[in-house]
Amino acid sequence: MALCAAGGAAQAPADGPPRTKAFNDPFVQVTHAIAQCPVPEGPLYTEAEVRELAHVRSQHGGSCHRVGCCRLPNSYLYDAEIIPRVQRYIQQDGRFDDTSVWVLGERRLVTLKGCVQSQAQSDSLEKAVWLVDDVMGVINLLQVGTDAAAARYLLALPQKP
């Protein structure tokens, strides 16, 4: 992600070790109106990254649950519930029908990726997602327009025919 922050989108590496959706973090496209929107890469990990992250991921939210402040014993367990609610909220709201947005759930944080019509619409979408139950934070990587070089997220590899 450092490449994205440094100035423009980076494309996922085509070569190197295989990457999989090992942790099953929910990642779905919730709106589809902007056909040329750069498609974000989903949450993919190499085997080495999985080994490195597994322990940390198993610990997130454990102390919160032990002291009775959280319903589930791990923060990542909420994501499978949160993302469908976020999807319904965005689709039923009506203000975002002219966007192309993907949402990713990781540790009760919702990351927004994709294209919107204006900065005001981006801000409104972020605020709307904050209203969804159990969301602990929103990471807004939405862009105005469809310029792939302006994307603030890794881009998916083009589909092979």
Listing of model-derived features with the role each one plays in the protein:
Residues M1-P161:
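N-terminal targeting leaders
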